[in-house]
């Protein structure tokens, strides 16, 4: 073992750090060692997969594009299965969405740079729905906040909330520093949340919004009167990651590590009732005006969510434009099942690779977005400069 700063490296890691595997591996290992020093890691661990953010041209701009194309030119490549976060547009249907040629050209260059590094251009915030499904206890380096929450909490994998460059560096080296949620002692509950009312639909996002603001970077432990679905947990985790910085939570009797979470030792506890949920739902809306665009799929819709939307749209037409956001893989399955035809016959559009948060929706003339995602409601006013209306998707479609 060789010590570099506070982090000990094995012989292979030391060779990476010394440049024996090339400049880009060396640069990436330097990033990982620096992160390890900052956060007090003692060593590196192998990762089984990576999930890389910093994909939308809207968010990374020309500086990010140049950084990625420089890595590509220097022959960078990933060592583990790696998937991409959403881009700023549907890579196939961007013209139908109304985005400019210039934006599209630069967005495509970003995705091509990642593809050249062997990062799978899946462009989704739900990699666990399309095959990037780490085993319980395995170490990964994921960066999308809602995906990090799902991986840690629902799958029982181990990841910190990586920045885009850190996740890419981990993917290139196949390593990440062992600190934070990679360590068992940091995965115990710090806040007990007793939910005293029945929840459905966007109530889970409202609950996450409440909890994230209180928990901050802590680890909530929930007790429910009902049994949340996987899609409910997806919405809950995404909301907590946006209103706070929650990257791991436990649900009594549901999530894989709940028996090891030590909820009785949590330092704080809260109760949440129906009045709290109603107040949060009202707070998440910034206007009483009707939306001129409904955006569903933050995080990206599962196939079952699209099935239910299509079933509803057989008898109901949206009062305004409608986007149903998902991954290309789930979108393809929705097309095969006939769900896309139903949604688009009703006036909606199934869009892949992107979402309302990282797409330049503000350039399309919309003023009010209707969302059933607390994460989207939290981000849209700041990132898009638009008002948000928060409600169940059925209420948004049929006001």
Curated annotation (Swiss-Prot):
Gene Ontology BP terms: isoprenoid biosynthetic process
Organism annotation: Methanothermobacter thermautotrophicus (strain ATCC 29096 / DSM 1053 / JCM 10044 / NBRC 100330 / Delta H)
Protein name listed in UniProt: Phosphomevalonate dehydratase large subunit
Cofactor binding, per record: Binds 1 [4Fe-4S] cluster per subunit.
Keyword Transport tagged: no
Family per similarity comment: Belongs to the AcnX type II large subunit family.
Transmembrane segments: none
Catalytic activity: (R)-5-phosphomevalonate = (2E)-3-methyl-5-phosphooxypent-2-enoate + H2O
């Amino acid at each position: 073992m060789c010590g570099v700063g506070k982090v000990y490296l094995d012989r292979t890691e030391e060779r990476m750090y010394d440049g024996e595997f090339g400049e880009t591996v060396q640069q990436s290992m330097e990033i990982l060692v620096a992160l390890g020093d900052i956060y007090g890691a003692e060593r590196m661990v192998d990762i089984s997969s990576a999930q890389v953010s910093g994909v939308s041209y809207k968010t990374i701009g020309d500086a990010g594009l140049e950084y990625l194309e420089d890595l590509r030119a220097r022959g960078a490549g990933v060592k583990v299965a790696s998937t991409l976060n959403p881009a700023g547009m549907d890579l196939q249907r961007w013209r139908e969405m109304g985005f400019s040629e210039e934006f599209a050209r630069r967005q495509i260059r970003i995705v091509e740079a990642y593809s050249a590094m062997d990062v799978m251009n899946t462009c989704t915030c739900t990699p666990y729905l399309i095959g990037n499904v780490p085993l319980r206890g395995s170490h990964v380096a994921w960066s999308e906040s809602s995906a990090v929450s799902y991986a840690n909490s629902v799958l029982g994998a181990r990841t910190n909330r990586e920045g885009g460059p850190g996740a890419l560096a981990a993917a290139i080296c196949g390593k990440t520093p062992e600190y934070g949620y990679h360590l068992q002692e940091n995965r115990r509950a710090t806040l007990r949340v007793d939910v005293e009312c029945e929840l459905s639909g966007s109530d889970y996002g409202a609950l996450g919004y409440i909890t994230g603001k209180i928990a901050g970077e802590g680890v909530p432990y929930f007790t429910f009167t009902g049994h949340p679905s996987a899609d409910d947990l997806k919405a809950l985790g995404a909301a907590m990651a946006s209103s706070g910085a929650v990257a791991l939570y436990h649900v009594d009797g549901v999530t894989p590590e709940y028996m090891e979470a030590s909820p009785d030792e949590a330092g704080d506890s809260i109760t949440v009732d129906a009045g709290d949920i109603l107040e949060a739902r009202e707070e998440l809306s910034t206007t009483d005006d009707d939306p001129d665009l409904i955006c569903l799929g933050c995080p990206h819709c599962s196939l079952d969510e699209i099935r239910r939307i299509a079933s509803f749209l057989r008898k109901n037409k949206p009062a305004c434009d409608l986007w149903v956001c998902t991954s290309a893989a789930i979108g393809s399955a929705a097309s095969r099942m006939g769900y896309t035809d139903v949604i688009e016959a009703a006036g909606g559009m199934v869009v892949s690779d992107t979402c309302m948060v990282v797409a330049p929706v503000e350039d399309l003339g919309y003023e009010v977005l209707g969302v059933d995602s607390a994460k989207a409601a939290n981000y849209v006013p700041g990132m898009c400069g638009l008002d948000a209306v928060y409600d169940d998707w059925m209420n948004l479609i049929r006001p």
